[in-house]
From Swiss-Prot:
Organism listed in the record: Xanthomonas axonopodis pv. citri (strain 306)
Reaction equations catalysed: sn-glycerol 3-phosphate + an acyl-CoA = a 1-acyl-sn-glycero-3-phosphate + CoA
Domain text: The HXXXXD motif is essential for acyltransferase activity and may constitute the binding site for the phosphate moiety of the glycerol-3-phosphate.
Extent of Pro residues compositional bias: 1-17
Protein name: Glycerol-3-phosphate acyltransferase
Subcellular location: Cell inner membrane
Enzyme class of the recorded protein, top EC level: transferase
Pfam family, one: GPAT_C
Topological category with respect to the lipid bilayer: Peripheral membrane protein
Amino acid sequence: MPEQNPLPFPDGQPSPPSTAAADTGATAAALPLAEPVPPAVAPSIAPSVAAARSGKRPWWARLLGRLADPWLSLTIEPDQPGRYDDGRPVVYVLEDYGMSNALILDKACREVGLPSPLVPLPGDPLERKRAYLALSRRSSSNSLIPEQRGGKTHSDSLAKLLQAHRVRADLDVHLVPVSIFVGRAPDKQSGWFAVLFSENWALVGRFRRLLSVLLNGRTTIVRFAPPISLRQTMAEGLPPERTLRKLQRVLRTHFRRIREAVIGPDLSTRRLLVDQVLAAESVREAIAIQAKRDNSKPVDAWRKAHAYAWEIAADYSSPVVRSASFLLTHVWNRIYAGVLVHHLDKLKQAAPGHEVVYVPSHRSHMDYLLLSYLLYERGIVPPHIVAGINLNLPVVGTLLRKGGAFFIRRSIKGNALYSAVLSEYVAQLVAGGYSIEYFVEGGRSRTGRLLQPKGGMIAMTLRAYLRQPRKPVLFQPVYIGYEKLMEGNSYLDELTGRPKEKESIWGLLWSIPKVLKQNYGQVVVNFGEPIALNDVLAKHAPDWDGQPLPEDEKPTWLAPAVDMLSTQIQTRINCAADVNPINLLALALLSTPKHAMGEADLIAQIELCKKLLAEMPYSDRVTVTPHTPARIITHAEEINVLTRVSHPLGDVLSVSGDTAVLLSYFRNNVLHLFTASSWVACCFQNNRRMSRAGLLRLGRTVYPFLQAELFLPWSEDRFAERIEQTIDMFVREGLLLNVTDDDGGILARNTGQTDEVFRLRAIGHSLQQAFERYYIAISVLVKNGPGVLGAGELESLCQQAAQRLSLLYAPAAPEFFDKTLFRGFIQKLRELRLVWPDENSKLMFDERLDAWAKDAKFILGRELRHTIERVSPAAAKPDVVVPPQ
């Protein structure tokens, strides 16, 4: 994979290096930026060897120290902490208590010549026979399960120290905060088990801490901070209680910022988020309404809301994510021939200061893991991922949840309490600045096309931002391209009518050995052009002044903004497509009746496709495989996509029946990239000659429907320009001939069955079935007449006609009779006012639709048009009851 420079974001937090052997000096230089300004810092002095305190360390400390020394190797920051000792008494401050912390601190002090924390100060002002204190007390439990950091703060020792300064005017103790990180970032040679016990935000028990020291003690960081003079702090004249609280607050803030700088921000906030969700006013109102509706006690409704929130919430765990990254590295190396990433550097430039919402294409369950893995490996905090509740399987669900997934139900219609809890949870994530990832398509595409977006999560994100516009939101489209799908066979079953199998832990376990034996080719992840939410709001809500909107306010511009944003996301995903070898093979081979070509013809067709992409680039973020056509064919044979049949007149390359259906998936991935060239080629399928002006007129007519179906980025004028460019290129390649040279001149294809005619037909084949679908819809409407069919009835009749056409004649691609594609076409007809509903919601139309249907003769052959008209059904008419005579 290409190397990317890690950028610490979000919130500008420094990211840890990928290995524990990072440059110590660089780390030390970065950390002071994260420290709070202390109330009083003693002046630094030149380094010196500290005079030893009177007395020896306790015998138990010497014994345990000898036992621990072989397991500890310390990186001490800064390089010369001895400069903090000027002979005045020093008390070290730790983030939390623990025997291991005391021993590590003692070892660090001995190594740099500082006074031991285990020898008390003269007079023992702490009254604990030691010279260190801690803000928090570690759990006494021996459990392996960590507790959340940030519990009760113990300040007795600090209070005693401050009181001693009030009693003794000559006393001036320096507090030196010391941060200890055991196994902050163990390298990959340490193993995934060691990572489970590496440093994180959780307070852990003694046994877990012991394992952490044994496994990761050799990658321990000890960070000394500048000293704080208690005498100068007390000189501020604050009351004793306020002095104590201020000092504790400064120390807590210091430790938190150092911890964030070293191991990243605290994302393990499941309990906190759930509590915040349940305390929100909107959820409390929903709980009250639910209790009244169910005629139950408010506590019962609260328990139901709590169960919903707990079912939804992620439980991010840094150790689990690190362990998973090690495991996934081995998995990717075994099943993929590489994972390529493009344009991530552009995201890193745009993302600082923004909350990033990742909106990738969704074609495989691998999407969840791949994107989070790639971000983590490049120093970016993985996002919280929206996942379907069907993936909340035993064990697997827990691991996904600890990797940042939060689970939502497929349908929340009619469940106001669940909707309120989910909306509030998303609002808390947005307000907290967490990055989020969701799939606007709602589910995995079974056809390879981008599905029509569902705006539910986008609407929740917008409303959350409008409620608390703290940090600008950036939507990041991501295209994920595969050469072979793990779910290919199950998609094939679903497309042929078999119901989708429910996910189960046993099914997953059963599939693992089979998956690990396969070669799934290469994966490419392309980051598209980001979309700033504020730019969308500036267009749809120019009067919004940036002030928070009340939760119950629903502005009229919200729905159009959601629709525009969801369409723009899909368009930007398509603008970041990758064209891999299997995409190019699918475009070529599926254009032939038997899905087979001679090797020379296949090489020529692939070369033509690559030339079209190079001479008429779709966008600057589209990537194309650099392989030659010959290498593409070899690669397809290696991953068992292509079959070679030897023949004396030349080898024939083909795909089998099931593989051909699956190849249509990969053709559809990149269909939008060839829209203009396919359109021009389609017009010459059944026409020997055609005028340039006619091509442009028909192109403008059909473009709105193609744009809605394929999420194309151009205006009609820009699409017309691409048609002109395509014509010029086809003329240069000899695929078309200029009969006359004027602007509206006549173009012609070659006569007979030449190679040029064959290549032109192959280019046009990919859009042929789209135009057939359009004609089916028009034919069904015209056959039934205006005011007869509703939109839903028309969809069903179109689907039936397409299925029958596929059964009686040449088999079609699975999406040919996809009802959602007919629905999109009908919706666009309504937007263009070519059809409109009457008072009974029946579709009306006029002679313009007849004229539109007549234009089909330029694209579809006479026989095909006649066949479609024959299979187009009429609506069932109610039986007429004849009254008795």
